[in-house]
Amino acid sequence: TMEDFDRMLQGMHDRGIRLVMDLVVNHTSDEHPWFIESRSSKDSPYRDYYFWREGKDGKEPNNWVSCFSGSAWKYDETTDMYYLHLFSSKQPDLNWDNPAVRKDVFSMMNWWCEKGIDGFRMDVISMISKKPGLPDGKLQPGAVYADPGCVNGPHVHEYLQEMNREVLSHYDLMTVGECAGVTIEEAKKYAGADGKELSMVFQFEHIDLNDG
């Protein structure tokens, strides 16, 4: 219960321990109230909280591959359209281009900050901005699906700076972004000395060190 959480948080702080929460806002569960409402009707006020597209010639809207293999699109018979999921089909991607999505995400973050948490570890935060129009990716020889190219999207820094203004800058927080596919130079934009986005990032290059 939330009472259990409050008691745990107070106990941690009494012992000089800080609590950093996992923040997953590139996508939600397909059981989240937003998605349940979004899929219910094309006219739902939550429809544009996610990416819904019609199929092309009886196939997916584009050739993007999911990080978990297969198409990044799943057909939903309720409205005869597909929704985007860069990961599992149980994890539909949020549409960060929609200001209402950003407002609700920031409101949720502020709520947790007011509870007294000490930071956020942000899951795949470098992927929240998709290419305008969701164009087909470049197919590699022999491939069926293409890399969606959603890392370091056109508005990712704009959205993180907005997050900083609306939430992060108002609290004493440690923030770390999971940024797969982000170069060292690009990482400086996410966690620069100007403090306009995140405290730090972690990358995955170290995994390949033994490969030479």
Placement of each model-derived feature along the sequence:
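Short, small-residue-rich loop/turn micro-motifs
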Residues: 124-129, 204-206
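Acidic/aromatic-lined carbohydrate-recognition and catalytic surfaces
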Residues: 1-110, 114, 127-182
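Hydrophobic residues within beta-strands of alpha/beta enzymes
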Residues: 120-122
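Noncatalytic carbohydrate-binding groove/subsite architecture in carbohydrate-active enzymes
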Residues: 179-212
